[in-house]
Amino acid sequence: TYVYAKEVFGENASYLKLGLVNPLPDKLIRSFCAEVERVIVVEELDPVIETYVKSLGIACDGKNLLPELSEFSQEVLAKCLLDKQPEFVAIEDEIPNRPPVLCPGCPHRGLFFALKKMKVTVSGDIGCYTLGSAPPLSAVDSTLCMGASISGLHGMNKSGGISPENSVAVIGDSTFAHSGVTGLMNIVYNKGISTVIIADNSITGMTGHQQNPTTGKTLKGEPTYALNLEKLCDALGIKDVKVIDPNDIKSMEEGLRDSLSRKEPSVIISRRPCVLLKEVKKDAYYVIDSD
């Protein structure tokens, strides 16, 4: 909203951009408002900041001018605050749609390539590996919420809707620690024979490379106990636990065939560090020869 306001008003207005909204900086707000003639609080959805500013005894405009629903844009601010439509530059060339994809060199690519090649039904989860659902891999068939990959697959296998002989759950290492353990526990407890793949890239990739219980470091980067996924799965009662490098496509396919053929629950830990980690050595580069 700050950038939108700057683009609409330019140098004709003063701006206070709040970097922290809880607690709100009373002194800073009072100081800024004392230097201007009129205060307009530009915030999306509920008037949280506006209500707080008014509680300080400061008169301001906000939701009496701006909508409480949907996202703001330059067009919305210009229409509501200046009563005019902004001029847009027409672009004659059609810009191609570029949906997000897994990073070049991402270890999850090998995993999803093997799953796609084998035409396995994949119950997905929430993480950067969710992008395995996007073209050209298009390997993920369902995604609901954190932990739902395992519990969802277990339910589908138990109900007879999807055969456990050709279906897997894919969940990341940090998401597994967050809300996947109980789902795997239920598979064992309910005598299921589902196959679960833990995509272990040694970090929490989707939200900015935060540490997690499996990395051996706290969020501050301090050394700590690293959760051993193999031992945890064994403690839950999983007898068939494999660790496979997803870049080794042949081994991944062989491991998948073996796990899917078993009449017991199986776990495959697809382990290779995220290619964006600083400590990962990039010792082999490949380019596309367009000729």
Q: Predicted regions span which residues?
A:
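Active-site diphosphate/adenylate-binding microenvironment
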Residues: 90-150, 159-162
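General beta-strand structural signal in soluble alpha/beta enzymes
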Residues: 15-17, 41-43, 60-63, 89, ...
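Terminal amphipathic helices with adjacent charged low-complexity linkers/tails
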Residues: 14-88, 284
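Short helix-loop-beta junction
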Residues: 7-16, 231-237
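Short gly/pro/ser/thr-enriched loop/turn and capping motifs at secondary-structure boundaries
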Residues: 22-23, 47-48, 66-70, 129-131, ...
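Short acidic, glycine/serine/threonine-rich loops at helix termini
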Residues: 4-10, 27-28, 51-55, 72-73, ...
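Thiamine diphosphate
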Residues: 133-267
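Ferredoxin-like iron-sulfur electron-transfer modules
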Residues: 91-105, 243-261, 274-291
